[in-house]
Amino acid sequence: MNKTLKYIVLLTFACFVGKGYAQELKSEVFSLLNLDYPGLEKVKALHQEGKDEDAAKALLDYYRARTNVKTPDINLKKITIGKEEQQWADDGLKHTFFVHKGYQPSYNYGEDINWQYWPVKDNELRWQLHRHKWFTPMGKAYRVSGDEKYAKEWAYQYIDWIKKNPLVKMDKKEYELVSDGKIKGEVENVRFAWRPLEVSNRLQDQTTQFQLFLPSPSFTPDFLTEFLVNYHKHAVHILANYSDQGNHLLFEAQRMIYAWSISL
């Protein structure tokens, strides 16, 4: 094998293994959408013809072309970022994630992100990791600077989180239990990653992140389908696992209404 060919092989290999999971088209997204909604005629026609790759491209074009979108949590025409959020965004690029103000400096979760890393055995630290508090600052940093590195890394981390945090069915009462050390792996992890309160946080924040990163080349048609399928999974999960009472229930219900009214 000559040096040039060897270099190409190694580079190709690095592209596949060095940055985690590749984005993939989720054709089930079309069954979750109202394809009779005004503006989605091309999407519907392409999907019915079995051209889902083209349909996904048309769907992304539709979202990017909209001009009447209101995002209550941020003014897209006047995006600013403070020093603290800029730090969270820059640290996030290196997988040093701002999770909790009570645990500073923030912890690094590894080049190959370990979403189950638990440096201090405090449930709040593990729960709040899954609120992704650095994602919106990364979006602001992207829009203010125009630097694609923020969008590229966000898309990578978003897909990485999906792949490494599968939703395992469990009784909703288990989400609030203190770990006794007997439950391990995915079953233990789902208690933290998919607790309804954390899911509702993501449900609200991702409406803002969607708009912030939408113009990016890293926001591909395939990524769009993964995003929408995951977003739908979040909403369905909350509907089946509302907290019984208290402020958690209030927040979960509020964010469901919020997500519906935003109409991604």
Residue map of PLM features:
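Helix-centric, low-specificity signal for extended rod-like, repetitive segments
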Residues: T12, Y37, K57-L59, E124, ...
